[in-house]
């Protein structure tokens, strides 16, 4: 692996010649940048991608075809100082961000589209594939390459249906079960796809390391390493981020010895707790005419048969169970009858089930059965058997269920209620017709004639073919038809035998006799509403599913286990738990269950959290000490300065859901995914993409859940710098690297971000903890609460970014990369504190630093006062104005644009001569402390100047009366002992304050000798530093700038002894030209400061205070003697 820029001078074996050339070119390029020149794009060769292999494999993944060069600003890439070019991103359509792109359905491929959308919104996998970070031999990872091309096209908005078709062909080529256009399970395809990606990348990740790296190369930052270098030897990307381990423990109830078994998993399949009963409604048909129909609600057992339902209905009606007939009745007529041995799950919740009570049978004589006995001849016995069968048909009764239909066949529709009659099978057609009319007589019109009308309707036997199931009016005994015999012969145990008949009326006859008679209306009992409410509110939580999944169970007697310690068969206790947790946790809800011989889909609502899923209760307890952790976790997964008991490694956030709509026989798959750019949820239904509210994510169709662990961002990711960062999510997104490739013609993301976005959803609270461990390591600095922001969690859980046009002028600046390191401590700030505490003199400082107090650093700063403080923006509660005071409590009028008065020293003419010679020269600091300063442009010329006389009068009166007001300045100054100013100073100014502290120490030590010389010659009168004689820059002030104010000689002498020490303990007023507009790399809070035209600021004053070092983000009081 190539050495980083910082390791070019390290020892170790010599690199090959191509590497040496590249190192020399990079060194030369850095030298040009250090001189302030900017090389052309063609002068410097593109830096290879981290982990790029130059020949033999180094372990991890194999070389990908056509490696993608590292994007500017990526970890390990040197970034030149100065303004950075605006990064380009694929432009959205104005309404949806990149990544919110649908997929074409190529014929029952909804299962494939839903899984691809969920994986595309998996940030770690999407960045890994889209940026080509995998190392696969060409032609040996076709599925992975096609998936990477498809994911890349979704995020660059270059998707075409041809890409998804090629991906489907690749899947069909290597997975024969997915050939054709059949429906498939989304979970089956997901596991197959992850396994295929693992196989494509596994072979190349087991190669030996070709060369031994020098020790200096092993000390480089983790951000410079590729994903393959971060993975353990022999592990693929899927194993590292998707795979974890189960632990199955078997405990002997006698000796309490435990046997553990560990198994890997890619997905956790959670069973859904089932209710023991379910809701079912049944309509009872009573023989009385006052109340014929009553609909009741029942809680029937799930694992039961129709016999249990028949028993429950008999209890509701108060009749014996063997006198209840259960049938299914729809608007088209009778459908089927239910028998006792049938599974109760064959009756759905919405089926119309009718229960008929058998009418009491009239007293009738016993059938005279002629005993066969022994006969003289077989012929006589046969004739007697035929006579007995004829008497059975002619004299037996049969139960008839009939309903009235208008029309014929399958197009008929029912009117009126169903009826149950008992009729003799030997009756004629006319007798059967009169019996039916007597039952429906009360439904007819009063004036309708029913006598001598001939055949009014046709009768069809239900349950057989329509063509051969009609009874003939010409038959003398129509109930003796073969169709009736067949129905009675096919009956099974459960209720009395019966025949279902459909009485089909002609529409004209029906209108003449019944008018507009419709179906019956059944009255609902109170039990219907009660049972519906009890069963419709059934839901469970995801934690309950985990508890049900990991609960301890005892082995059955047939599955007894022989304990190796007791050597006896024992019914051990089995418990399944999670031993390790993956970065990407995939949870499968088992909605398809096997009940008997039938598989059903469970529509139970499983309530799962969108953020903050705590997996700590479901992880196996370690028997080791708490410091041992959870196993061999990589170092980048462990947060810095966290207590060992803080469960940050157990928190997960949801980012995708795969839904199933329909039943087991057929359905449709959709996906709900959260976009990592705007934080909004979107619904993906093949090619249709629509925004989704957060309260609509949790549905009864949720099938597969995708969770990502918080802070599980590897150092090779573009988002690795977002830990502890407060910049926007756009500046840290990996898509910036993809959009910054050479030759990219895609538009900027700002065109999409300027579109109006919906309101910000509620982001889960960030964990707040005390960094006590850091305080102990840093020398006992004052403890300060550290709040991990939104960047601390997964990038897909960031809050949606609002419109750029509505965020003010500060948000319209070009996007910048965050240089905050994930694991590297702020080295520059620590070195600065150590340097100040050591009281050492800076190197390479051969000239006097006092000249900078009276001169300016450039031509654009002539209007600045020699003793004015460096401009610092402050945001205070009272509108951004801070009260300033002069030296030793001398006030500065708030209405004055002049600078505060600074007493002079008594160095005499020699000092004045040196100040003139050294005016305008920059201070030379050691390279170690060459920190950038924030240069704020002066806007004094934009302010209308007031009359000079009025200025001098106000200042003189204020100085004599000791007013507490301070002169306003174009920039806000830093006040050491002002509470408002201290509260108003933002964290962005801390690197600058650290630089001022350094300059104060250098300035103080440099001028100590001059104070001694001044004490030897007290006859030299003190000279004001603001007098024009000492500062040649003051003579050439810009027009419109206020004149320098002079102090009377007596007043200066009176204040000299009292204010002499205050001058040297005050902050330096240097204004050095900065080389870069960015903060130090080591500081996590260092950010470039921008000034909006029209913003007011002021120059600070000198005060006697105890200054603090804020470069580390913490306040530490330093004694004045150190300055």
Curated annotation (Swiss-Prot):
Active site location: 110 (nucleophile), 668 (proton acceptor)
Modification Phosphoserine, positions: 969, 1041
Record EC number: 3.4.19.12
Tissue expression from the record: Expressed in brain, aorta and lung at low levels.
EC primary class: hydrolase
One GO term describing the cellular component: nucleoplasm
Example of a GO biological process term: proteolysis
Segments of skewed composition (Basic and acidic residues): 979-990
The name this protein goes by in its record: Ubiquitin carboxyl-terminal hydrolase 43
Natural source organism: Homo sapiens
Higher taxonomy: Eukaryota, Metazoa, Chordata, Craniata, Vertebrata
Gene name tied to this protein: USP43
